[in-house]
């Protein structure tokens, strides 16, 4: 688990980390203001792309391979972001924020790698294996966006959080407030110098079973560990089908057949994997 520290931009390149922090501050000033984003990240993402005059499609559905968290690609002038809804909600949120950084680079820094080859986010990159600089930057951007310094200070005061003897339950409280994964919460506390490196390493050595047990016992951050199988979205497909229905643009038999097929697909995806 300590690879999270070793592979963090904060440890690898402090100067670049500060630059990313400035980017997040600028982004929030325009697209988010003072809100704690949580699961509104999907709306923030959509708003950002559409305000740059590019059609946007958000795809959220369960994929059997939970190692694949998200991907982004551009086809025929339209941007697609797919988020795997078979992973915990906090990880979906972080994945969306991670992908937002790649999109940010495309629009603000004219980095056209996204157009050429797209972006694929695997679970290990979020957890502890971010080896490429851009992935380290994207992880830093995501964590800073979801748990910005000012809001972290504010909420620490609201909940009277003390960081002198930080426990796993204190980290769970940060997770609950900001909807971030455990490792990201620990890293943010370390980055803001709420905890030292020794404490960070100790917290990161806590096993996943123990973390899950404490979430279950306390109820803290439990809502963000859920896998909401009812959330299935195929971009603007449903809206376009509705428009066709209103305009009578296709034969009724064809439309009913397509609607039945879509319903069948959705119901199949909502069934728990065996």
Predicted regions and their residues:
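Active-site hotspot residues in diverse enzymes, especially metal/ion-binding acidic/histidine motifs
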Residues: 1-274
